[in-house]
C-alpha cells in the first residue's frame, strides 16, 4: 500500500517517556474520514526496528478503521538504519528495561488520543510478540494482545493478564509457555 494513500492521515509522532529513554518516536496512521472515536492498535516490530513493512501494517490497520501506532525501539540509537542486519546488531545495544518503559508510554499515548475510544490492543511480531506479552502483564485494562512468537512472560506474571490473548506460536515454542489454562482452536 502506498505511503501517501489519500484515505489515510499518516505522520511520525514523538512524546515523552520519562521512565524509558526519554522520548518515543513512531509511525502513526488513522483513517482520513472517520465517524466517532476509534479503537487503537499498538504495532510492535520484530528485532529490525520500524521498517517499511511495519509501516505498511500500520497503514493497513488504519484502513480498517483503527488508529495504529508503531514505535521505533531503535529511535534512541538513531532509528531504523535501513539495513536489516545492522538493525539486529543495534538491538543488542538497547537497555531492555528502558525499552519496555517506552512501550508502556506508547500504550498510554494511544489510550489518551482524543480521536481514540480509550481502548488499546497490541500486536507484536517476533521480538514484538514478547513486548505484547509484557504489556499484557503490565496493563490491566489492555483491550487485547496478539503476539506472533516472542518471549513468554514469566510464569509468576501470567495471572496478571486480564486481556484476551490470541497467541501464534510454532509447536516447539509452545513448550516454553508457562503452564496455565489454555484454549486452542484449529
Q: Where are the predicted features?
A:
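N-terminal targeting or regulatory segments adjacent to alpha/beta-hydrolase or S9 domains
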Residues: 1-14
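Serine-hydrolase catalytic machinery in alpha/beta-hydrolase-like enzymes
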Residues: 12-112
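Short, thiol/selenol-centered motifs that function as redox-active sites or metal-ligating centers
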Residues: 46, 125-126, 170
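Active-site-adjacent alpha-helix of alpha/beta-hydrolase-fold enzymes
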Residues: 60-63, 174-186
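A short beta-to-alpha transition loop/helix N-cap that caps and shapes the active-site region
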Residues: 76-81, 152-158, 175-176
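Primarily recognizes the serine-hydrolase "nucleophile elbow" in alpha/beta-hydrolase
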Residues: 103-162
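Short beta-strand/loop motif that positions the catalytic acidic residue
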Residues: 161, 167-169
Amino acid at each position: 500500500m502506498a505511503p501517501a494513500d489519500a484515505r489515510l492521515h499518516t505522520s511520525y509522532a514523538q512524546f515523552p517517556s520519562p521512565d524509558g529513554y526519554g522520548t518515543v518516536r513512531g509511525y502513526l496512521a488513522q483513517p482520513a474520514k472517520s465517524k466517532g472515536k476509534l479503537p487503537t492498535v499498538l504495532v510492535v516490530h520484530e528485532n529490525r526496528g520500524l521498517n517499511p513493512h511495519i509501516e505498511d501494517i500500520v497503514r493497513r490497520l488504519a484502513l480498517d478503521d483503527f488508529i495504529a501506532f508503531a514505535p521505533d525501539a531503535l529511535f534512541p540509537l538513531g532509528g531504523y538504519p535501513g539495513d536489516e542486519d545492522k538493525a539486529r546488531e543495534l538491538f543488542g545495544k538497547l537497555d531492555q528495561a528502558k525499552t519496555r518503559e517506552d512501550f508502556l508510554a506508547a500504550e498510554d499515548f494511544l489510550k489518551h488520543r482524543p480521536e481514540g475510544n480509550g481502548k488499546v490492543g497490541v500486536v507484536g511480531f517476533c521480538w514484538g510478540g514478547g513486548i505484547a506479552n509484557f504489556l499484557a502483564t503490565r496493563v490491566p485494562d489492555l483491550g487485547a494482545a496478539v503476539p506472533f512468537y516472542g518471549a513468554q512472560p514469566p510464569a509468576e506474571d501470567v495471572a496478571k493478564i486480564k486481556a484476551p490473548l490470541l497467541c501464534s506460536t510454532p509447536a516447539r515454542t509452545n513448550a516454553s509457555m508457562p503452564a496455565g489454562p489454555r484454549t486452542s482452536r484449529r
